Curated annotation (Swiss-Prot):
Keywords: Cytoplasm, Hydrolase, RNA-binding, tRNA-binding. The keyword Phosphoprotein does not apply. An aminoacyl-tRNA editing enzyme that deacylates Ser-tRNA and/or Thr-tRNA mischarged by lysyl-tRNA synthetase (LysRS), threonyl-tRNA synthetase (ThrRS), seryl-tRNA synthetase (SerRS), alanyl-tRNA synthetase (AlaRS), valyl-tRNA synthetase (ValRS) and isoleucyl-tRNA synthetase (IleRS) in vitro. Also deacylates mischarged Hse-tRNA(Lys) and Hse-tRNA(Ser), and cognate Ser-tRNA(Ser) and Thr-tRNA(Thr) in vitro. The presence of cognate ThrRS abolishes the Thr-tRNA(Thr) deacylase activity, hence this activity is not applicable physiologically. Disruption phenotype: Growth defects with elevated alanyl-tRNA synthetase (AlaRS) or stress-inducible lysyl-tRNA synthetase (LysU) levels in the presence of excess Ser, and with elevated LysU or constitutive lysyl-tRNA synthetase (LysS) levels in the presence of excess Thr. Excess homoserine with elevated LysS, LysU or seryl-tRNA synthetase (SerRS) levels also leads to growth defect. Growth defects with LysU overexpression are much more pronounced than with LysS overexpression. Reduced sensitivity to aminoglycoside antibiotics neomycin, streptomycin and kanamycin. The gene is proXp-y. This is Multifunctional Ser/Thr-tRNA deacylase ProXp-y.
């Protein structure tokens, strides 16, 4: 299956879920750009509204857990904080093959929803404190969703974990 076809399956699944749950959202089709700054400008949203999705692997202390870690696009992740919260000793970004297997998306197109039973969903709360809408790529690099923050929290139900880097 091509990258586009795989991402399309995730996109359709996401849109079906949001529609079924009565979410207040809109889909924006745009040029496929990889940088958070560029895509937020195209979407007409603030960088801090962007939900950056990192597929991580937490290991150590008997823990071997894949995590979909969501944070505001204007923040940096502190992977050691994330590992500590999950109960592991270290966290690293997953390989492209693991990202593909767990999300069906290419890096940069991953929505902040886990559709895989082995992918634990956590989110840094700052993403939800500053804006009443969040924005994210929706399985494909050329499609974004802008979604009411309250609907995201209600539907996705992420575990809220402070793991952003602080000065």
């Amino acid at each position: 299956m091509t990258e586009m076809a795989k991402g399309s399956v995730t996109h359709q699944r996401l849109i079906a879920l949001l529609s079924q749950e009565g979410a207040d959202f809109r889909v924006v089709t745009h040029e496929a750009v990889g940088k958070c700054e560029a895509v937020s400008e195209i979407r007409g949203t603030a960088l801090g509204q962007g939900a950056k999705a990192l597929v991580c692997k937490v290991k150590g202390n008997g823990v071997n857990q894949h995590v979909l870690a969501i944070l505001a696009a204007d923040q940096q992740a502190d992977l050691s904080q994330l590992a500590s919260h999950i109960g592991g000793l270290r966290a690293s970004l997953a390989s492209p093959a693991e990202v593909d297997e767990l999300t069906g998306c290419v890096f940069g197109a991953i929505p902040p929803f886990s559709f895989h039973p082995k992918l634990k969903l956590v989110a840094d709360p700052l993403l939800f404190e500053r804006f009443d809408e969040i924005a994210f790529n929706a399985g494909m690099l050329d499609k974004s969703v802008i979604l009411k923050t309250a609907d995201y929290l209600r539907i996705a139900q992420p575990e809220l974990v402070n793991f952003r880097r602080t000065a």
